[in-house]
């Protein structure tokens, strides 16, 4: 199933709903959230969960839902644990009245486990900016949508950025580019891409895995201090990001040569290091900040009514 067909089916289904919703107005569109507010990844999971819930609440308050049919947001805490994530999916997929219309796993590990289930259950998976990169091939994975970008495209973009700073792709030859990565399916996603580009452009590549949850990185950064890579990339998440940035500062690694994936670029990641994080870079697949019309509507229709899940001053974090 491609996205156009999915959209058409969804619209057709919603247009048919008022006949069921009239009178008691009981029919709701089930859009679940696989949240992780607890554990080592909670500092990043909490604002994601708050923002997602606030957006769905805004649609209900501003528009009466979708085409007048309210959204039912069912949450389940995964703790960013793959096993718990699969259990959450099984628990919520048949939630009445509509069943889950879409699932966002918010974890590459959980996404990998849910992909085989998607075509059987006919529940679309949105893994936007994460998950299995090869799932972008809709002919092979018709129920998975990982737009607007993938980890392979992010790795390519970061190498291109480095090349631009160094004077072109030819200037990469002989440079050292290291990757500090979360030792999981998520962190391993860019390895093949970076290895292939190293072979093509002649830079020396080395991957340095960091085990869950990422608090022990002394040896990693001592190795970086010793071997002096020209650039360090990071595929981190949660507390791993905070520790890495502090460790980089402690060995005085140049922050403007330290670049994180888009999941390593929040305020939560840099605040513990304070001014020492100045210059640190990260990728992104969207514009930052909370000054867009959707954010204004969240303030008006959600927080002004006391319905917000987080702090008003952290909208758009």
PLM feature spans:
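Bacterial N-terminal signal peptides that target proteins for export
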Residues: 1-10
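C-terminal segment of classical bacterial N-terminal signal peptides
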Residues: 16-24
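Beta-alpha junction/loop-to-helix N-cap segments that form part of ligand/metal-binding clefts
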Residues: 30, 43-50, 62-138, 147, ...
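Extracytoplasmic "Venus flytrap"
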Residues: 31-53, 76-83, 107, 180-189, ...
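Signal peptide-proximal N-terminal region
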Residues: 50-73, 166-170, 199-202
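Extracellular/periplasmic Venus flytrap/periplasmic-binding protein
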Residues: 84, 94, 133-134, 142-251, ...
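Periplasmic-binding protein-like
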Residues: 93-106, 126-128, 176-180, 228-238, ...
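Extracellular/periplasmic periplasmic-binding protein-like sensory domains
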Residues: 248-317
């Amino acid at each position: 199933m491609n996205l156009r067909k999915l959209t058409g089916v969804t619209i057709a289904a919603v247009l048919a709903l008022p006949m069921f919703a009239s009178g008691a107005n009981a029919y709701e569109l089930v859009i679940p959230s696989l949240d992780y507010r607890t554990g080592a990844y909670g500092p990043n999971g909490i604002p994601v969960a708050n923002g997602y819930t606030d957006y769905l609440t805004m649609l209900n308050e501003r528009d009466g839902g979708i085409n007048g049919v309210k959204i039912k947001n069912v949450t389940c805490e995964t703790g960013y644990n793959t096993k718990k994530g699969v259990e959450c999916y099984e628990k919520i997929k048949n939630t009445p009245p509509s069943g889950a219309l879409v699932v966002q796993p918010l974890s590459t590990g959980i996404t990998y486990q849910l992909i085989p289930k998607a075509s059987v259950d006919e529940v679309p998976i949105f893994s936007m900016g994460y998950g299995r990169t090869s799932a972008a091939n809709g002919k092979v994975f018709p129920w998975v949508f990982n737009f607007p970008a993938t980890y392979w495209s992010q790795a390519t973009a970061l190498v291109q950025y480095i090349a631009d700073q160094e004077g072109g792709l030819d200037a990469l030859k002989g440079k050292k580019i290291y990757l500090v990565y979360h030792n999981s399916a998520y962190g391993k996603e860019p390895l093949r891409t970076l290895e292939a580009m190293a072979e093509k452009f002649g830079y020396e590549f080395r991957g340095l895995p960091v085990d869950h949850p990422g608090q022990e990185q002394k040896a990693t950064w001592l190795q970086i201090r010793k071997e002096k890579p020209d650039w360090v990339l990071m595929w981190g998440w949660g507390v791993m990001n905070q520790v890495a940035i502090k460790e980089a500062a402690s060995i005085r690694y140049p922050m403007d040569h330290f670049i994180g994936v888009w999941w390593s670029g929040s305020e939560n990641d840099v605040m513990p290091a304070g001014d020492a994080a100045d210059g640190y870079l990260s990728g992104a697949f969207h514009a930052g900040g909370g000054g867009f019309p959707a954010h204004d509507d969240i303030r008006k229709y959600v927080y002004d009514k006391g319905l917000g899940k987080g702090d008003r001053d952290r909208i758009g974090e």
